Amino acid sequence: MTELSGFQQEIARLFFSLQSSQGFVLAGGGALLASGLSIRPTQDLDFFGSPGQVSVSLALDQFLDAIQQQNWDYELLSHANDFARVRIVGSAELIVDLAIDVAPRFPIAQTPIGPVFSPLELAGRKLLALFDRAEARDFVDVYVLSKKFGNQKVFDAATQIEVSLNKQVLARMMNTLERFSDDELPIDHSEVGTLRKYFANWAKDLDGA
């Protein structure tokens, strides 16, 4: 099974060693890997905190100091009150996002590298990512997670995070899968056909609901 790279694990542990990291959790593809829910490699790490509970600016300042102490190079790509993006170059290269996001709806899970969203919350948030942007990796992640938890549980988890999730709009987003070629979907080619049928059927069910 694919895991976080050694450098990614090092970065995550460094971040969670900071006092200002309290209240942040690992999210996204990195959390899926850390939780053993995905084999799709990721090129970035996302750390999310709840509104009013964390400070992106304070965490960023401490994080950049810690990066410098490791003698790694970095470039601050973006910085606002609720979001920051840093490119870090050490033994490898990595993009790290610090962001304010919706508070967790499920108990936080603990992994050897630090706190992450619970598996079902990760699944719900991935479905919301598909709803918002529908990138190739979102289809693959939702496919894998929905096979594990079931469509209804994943949808219900997503609605606990975002109550306004609309079934018909979600169906339309699922139908945009056709804009990606088979080679653009980060999954074994033997599963691409099944994945396409899976979303076609799910979109049909949602559209008729």
Where are these regions (language model features)?
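Compositionally biased terminal segments of proteins
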Residues: 1-209
